[in-house]
């Protein structure tokens, strides 16, 4: 049986880990290198590092901090933010990332997905999609959730998977930071259309939210930030709870 994964997320702005709600109201939390070290020791299955303002500010991702983070951990590291070209993929992978997350860059130039998959393999290309309901439709947002692209999220995600994305990280803007549970309706809609590992992001508030999430078909991992950063829920405690309730975890 394939084990499920618990993934903490470091949203980094100006070299610091930050956290907001519904992608707004960003507050400073901690140093990313210290947090990466802590999560590695705490039993996280993977770590996600997002430079959350790189795309909006039209610049490249912070490679100096990323290199330090990568050197401190021994679990898979996925990195995103400001990834717009194959050169960006190269730079991020050379810093120590295992997988590269692409979001706004693919929306600007969809050919980036098949080109990256051809060069590095599908397993290296993670589609990150920021999704929000607009007039009853799931829509894709760009630039850190600031810009409505007008694209149907389900169609966009399906296209990316068909063209080389090997994993999907689905960020629900509607549930982000609210701590009332994952966006199961959106996740189910995506899982019914694609057959790749899906990481659910946005809305985790308690361990029961993860248990409910993993009862839904096609969801491989739960990602969270605030509840882990603020120590409202320990990763080891969460994994032991899930394991005891029939969800296979790596302990």
List each model region and its residues.
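Conserved anion-binding
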Residues: 12-14, 18-19, 97-170, 174-175
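Structural preference for beta-strand elements that scaffold enzyme active sites
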Residues: 5-9, 46, 74-78, 99-101, ...
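Glycine/small-residue-rich loop that forms an oxyanion/phosphate-binding "nest" at active or ligand-binding sites
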Residues: 53, 61-120
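Conserved, mostly hydrophobic/aromatic
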Residues: 11, 39, 47, 79, ...
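Charged helix-capping and loop-helix junction motifs
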Residues: 60-67, 110, 150-154, 180-188
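Catalytic cores of alpha/beta
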Residues: 73, 77-96, 185-221
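Glycine-rich phosphate-binding active-site loops on the catalytic face of alpha/beta enzymes
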Residues: 91-112, 172-177, 203-209, 217-236
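Glycine-rich, proline-tolerant flexible connector loops at the mouths of alpha/beta enzymes
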Residues: 46-64, 104, 169-180
């Amino acid at each position: 049986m394939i084990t499920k994964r618990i993934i903490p997320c470091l949203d980094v702005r100006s070299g610091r880990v930050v956290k907001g709600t519904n992608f707004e109201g960003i507050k400073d939390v901690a140093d990313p290198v210290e947090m990466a070290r802590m999560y590695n020791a705490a039993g996280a299955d993977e770590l996600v590092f997002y430079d959350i303002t790189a795309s909006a500010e039209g610049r490249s991702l912070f490679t100096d901090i990323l290199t330090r983070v990568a050197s401190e951990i021994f679990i898979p590291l996925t990195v995103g933010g400001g990834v717009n070209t194959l050169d960006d993929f190269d730079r991020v992978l050379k810093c120590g990332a295992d997988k590269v997350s692409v979001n706004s860059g693919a929306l600007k130039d969809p050919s980036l997905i098949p080109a990256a998959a051809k060069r590095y393999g599908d397993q290296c290309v993670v589609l990150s999609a920021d999704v929000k309901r607009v007039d009853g439709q799931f829509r894709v947002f760009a630039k850190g959730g600031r810009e409505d692209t007008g694209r149907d999220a389900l169609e966009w995600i399906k296209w990316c998977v068909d063209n080389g994305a090997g994993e999907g990280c689905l960020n629900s803007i509607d549930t982000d930071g609210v701590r009332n549970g994952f966006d199961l309706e959106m996740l189910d809609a995506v899982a019914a259309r694609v057959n790749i590992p899906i990481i659910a992001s946005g809305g985790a508030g308690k361990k029961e939210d993860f248990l409910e999430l993993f009862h839904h078909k096609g969801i491989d991992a739960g990602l969270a930030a605030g509840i882990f950063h603020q120590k409202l829920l320990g990763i080891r405690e969460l994994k032991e709870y899930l394991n005891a309730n029939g969800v296979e975890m790596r302990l």
